[in-house]
């Protein structure tokens, strides 16, 4: 069984080339199915997609042996290395095998690996290296890692995609799945996968006449409802063993789905109910990792290995660390059906924090591995007002359920900070949405389960800012965001310089007058320091809205804080207990069946 195949960069992937191959000297040429090395060339596959995570394969799976396979023709030297992170933080490596080859026709070389290393001491990753000397050339046509261990577990994987009016993205991903997996005889998922698309926008073909695809029109009750419907549809087939939740607007990699499937097939019994999580790589800087799992620390989300440049070998190794993760985001998250049956469905929170809450509820750390990922647009400059409402309301729900010792004081501090940051960003409507989120949280789970989520969302959208205006001057391009700032996290920080904080980020000082200054929506509050007029915009659409410094907003803030404090002090404990008591009902199959059915009925009555 091949557990990992050697991947070569395809056309249009120049920026990602070092995620596949590293050239230390000489030159090479890539073709569709082969790699040609010129003389005096040295290449390594110690990369994100081609290094073998041997330590994780041996930890989580039943494999008893491991072989490296390389198909080449020509002359050169083949080497297999084991590389790991030393206790001091450096990189150590050991040569496991070296083979000189000289062949006029393609020849497959297979090297046994585990007998060359102590299984108890296996660390890090394995990789292949090929070198040609003077007058030597070769062509690499195939490679990978195999095991003779036979899978004893039947895996039937269902991919559940939730979408809302993103036909282009969904169609593209479905085509990739069809061509690269379902119709590909060389894929382990050949005619052994099913895709369920929950269509919250009702814009896709209703009945897909395809054995591998089901499209389910669904009420737009948010991503949580879309994924709940996908889970429910998957569970109708008793043969389904795992549900892979996936966002509609990601760029998928077929080999990631194949690796997920192979991991599931070979997992040790003690890990059979573990979730497998995929990392998110940025779609603008495609070699930068945005997150590989996340931790939830006292109510604050911490992305693991964020801003990591995966072109660097040391970062590929660092990514092998099993740092504790509490959840994996649902842009790529594979959940065993047995876990869904035991732990239930998502909370009906529309969007945001549904994946965090589910990870905390299951209480199991997701398995993550290099190469299992998707590409997705980064979030720092997509800041719709409505997100403030969902972030605050849903964070209050999650913290009350899972953060020990969380009470009204902690909730009040979180709310005050959120409102203050919005004040510093001149987003006064968002301040009111934060307050609305607190009020709605205190209404309790009964209100949450009975409210019409689509109507609420529509109302919230009309309450917040809209990116509809065009700036008459020149605005910075999205690409002007410095890569160094992304790698260090400076581009997306709410931290404010202490000196600026003493003046409330310039609110206690005279504003600098002048023409409105364009500021990207996700920029840090310090970018607004002493600004009078600003134009806040989305760099993707180039649309935005005007705002300016209003002193009355500063003076009104203490009164709103006082109102919220009194309300939290009086009602928070009751609401918290109510959510704790209702969690089982809110995440049950019975609730979701009734909830979605009622939404369908209301929708039909309006027609």
Q: Which role fits each region the language model picked out?
A:
Residues 1-125, 130-131, 393-394, 400-607:
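Terminal low-complexity segments of carbohydrate-biosynthetic enzymes
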Residues 306-333, 382:
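A recurrent flexible, glycine/aromatic-enriched loop bordering the glycosyltransferase active site
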Residues 141-149, 369-385:
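Active-site donor/metal-binding and catalytic loop motifs
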Residues 330-332, 341-360, 365-374, 386-387:
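Donor nucleotide-sugar recognition loop
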Residues 166-185:
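Short, well-formed alpha-helical segments that are part of the catalytic scaffolds
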Residues 238-251:
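Short beta-strand-to-loop acidic/aromatic patch adjacent to the donor-nucleotide binding site
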Residues 208-225, 233:
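Conserved donor nucleotide-binding strand/loop of the catalytic core
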């Amino acid at each position: 069984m091949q557990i990992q195949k050697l991947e070569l960069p395809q056309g249009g992937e120049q920026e990602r080339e070092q995620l596949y191959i590293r050239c230390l000297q000489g030159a090479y040429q890539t073709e569709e199915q082969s790699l040609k090395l010129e003389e005096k060339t040295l290449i390594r596959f110690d990369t994100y997609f081609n290094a073998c995570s041997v330590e994780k394969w041996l930890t989580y799976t039943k494999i008893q042996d491991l072989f490296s396979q390389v198909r080449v023709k020509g002359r050169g030297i083949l080497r297999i290395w084991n590389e790991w992170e030393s206790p001091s933080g450096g990189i150590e490596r050991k040569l496991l095998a070296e083979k000189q080859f000289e062949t006029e026709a393609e020849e497959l070389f297979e090297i046994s690996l585990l007998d060359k290393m102590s299984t108890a001491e296996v660390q890090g990753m394995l990789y292949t290296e090929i070198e040609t000397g003077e007058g030597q050339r070769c062509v690499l046509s195939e490679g990978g890692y195999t095991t003779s261990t036979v899978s004893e577990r039947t895996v039937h994987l269902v991919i559940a995609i939730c979408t809302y009016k993103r036909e282009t993205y969904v169609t593209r991903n479905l085509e990739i799945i069809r061509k690269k997996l379902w119709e590909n005889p060389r894929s382990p998922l050949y005619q052994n996968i099913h895709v369920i698309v929950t269509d919250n926008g009702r814009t896709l073909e209703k009945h897909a006449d395809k054995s591998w695809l089901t499209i389910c029109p669904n009420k737009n009750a948010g991503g949580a409802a879309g994924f709940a419907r996908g889970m429910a549809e998957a569970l109708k087939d008793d043969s389904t063993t795992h549900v892979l939740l996936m966002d509609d607007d990601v760029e998928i990699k077929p080999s990631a789905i194949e690796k997920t499937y192979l991991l599931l097939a070979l997992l040790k019994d003690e890990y059979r109910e573990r979730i497998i999580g995929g990392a998110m790589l940025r779609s603008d800087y495609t070699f930068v990792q945005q997150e590989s799992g996340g931790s939830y620390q006292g109510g604050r989300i911490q992305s693991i290995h964020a801003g990591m440049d995966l072109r660097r070998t040391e970062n590929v190794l660092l990514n092998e660390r099993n740092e504790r993760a509490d959840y994996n985001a649902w842009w790529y998250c594979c959940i065993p059906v047995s876990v869904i049956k035991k732990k239930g469905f998502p909370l009906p929170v529309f969007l945001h924090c549904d994946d965090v809450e589910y990870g905390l509820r299951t209480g199991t750390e997701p398995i993550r591995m290099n190469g299992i990922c998707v590409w997705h647009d980064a979030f720092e400059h997509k800041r719709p007002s409505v997100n403030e409402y969902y972030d605050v309301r849903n964070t209050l729900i999650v913290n009350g359920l899972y953060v020990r010792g969380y009470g009204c004081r902690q909730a009040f501090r979180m709310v005050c900070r959120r409102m203050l940051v919005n004040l510093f960003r001149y987003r006064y409507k968002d301040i009111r949405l934060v307050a609305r989120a607190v009020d709605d949280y205190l209404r309790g789970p009964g209100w949450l389960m009975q409210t019409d989520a689509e109507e609420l969302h529509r109302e919230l959208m009309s309450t917040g800012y809209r990116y509809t205006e065009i700036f008459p001057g020149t605005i910075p391009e999205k690409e002007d965001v410095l890569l160094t700032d992304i790698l260090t996290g400076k581009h997306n920080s709410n931290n404010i310089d202490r000196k600026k904080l003493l003046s409330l980020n310039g609110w206690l000082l005279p504003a600098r007058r002048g023409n409105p200054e364009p500021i990207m929506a996700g920029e840090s509050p310090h970018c607004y320091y002493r600004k009078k007029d600003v134009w806040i915009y989305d760099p993707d659409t180039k649309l935005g809205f005007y705002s300016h410094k209003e002193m009355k907003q500063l003076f009104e803030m203490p009164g709103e804080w006082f109102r919220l404090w009194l309300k939290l002090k009086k009602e928070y404990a009751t609401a918290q207990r109510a959510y704790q008591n209702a969690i089982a009902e809110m995440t049950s199959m019975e609730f979701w069946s009734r909830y979605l059915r009622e939404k369908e009925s209301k929708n039909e009555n309006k027609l």
